[in-house]
Design a protein with these regions (language model features):
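Catalytic-core regions of core metabolic enzymes
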Residues: 1-167
Length: 167
């Protein structure tokens, strides 16, 4: 719904929005400029990458996570419904390659002050939080922030890391 001071103003507003949605032009440094379709493409575009964020249906996540780990990246895996057998295998790959796998089903991380997933803007400080529960980690981080204590890292590992089967 567009509300404007007249039909001409409304039409102009709609035209601007439509142009923005269909434009192939990008400005250097914008999010639209960097949208790799694969792990390999992302690394070709920027070989300094260290973390891959994976958010696909759980059925497809293991393939992408494994590609990222085998490419030397740490992984933030937002995807849920990843079969537990795949999660165990991926955790083993991460350990053997000395990479960090956050998730699957990891909703929150703050790495060197950069939020991934659902995260709050926090003052920087000396505290690091590692938790299975992203909601719990955010609550602790926000309480620390409100108390004037900054947080440098918040790492969610995913809820199944605490189970005997995965942990």
């Amino acid at each position: 719904v567009v509300r404007a001071d007249g039909a001409d103003a409304g039409d102009a507003a709609v035209a601007v929005v439509e142009a923005g949605l269909t434009s192939a032009e990008t400005t250097p440094g914008t999010v639209a400029e960097v949208r790799p379709a694969t792990v390999r493409e992302g690394l070709v575009r920027d070989e300094a990458l260290t973390v891959a964020a994976v958010s696909t249906p759980g059925t497809y996540a293991p393939v992408v996570v494994e590609q990222a780990l085998r490419s030397g990246l740490h992984v933030f895996c937002f995807s849920d419904n990843v079969p537990v057998e795949d999660e165990i295998r991926l955790k083993q790959i991460a350990v053997s390659s000395r990479r960090l796998l956050m998730g699957p089903d990891c909703g929150t991380a703050v790495l060197d002050g950069v939020p991934l997933g659902f995260a709050n803007v926090l003052r920087s400080g000396p505290v690091a939080i590692v938790a299975a529960s992203g909601t719990g980690a955010q609550e602790v981080a926000c309480l620390l922030d409100a108390a004037g204590i900054g947080v440098a890292q918040v790492i969610g590992v995913g809820g199944r890391d605490l189970t005997a089967e995965v942990g």
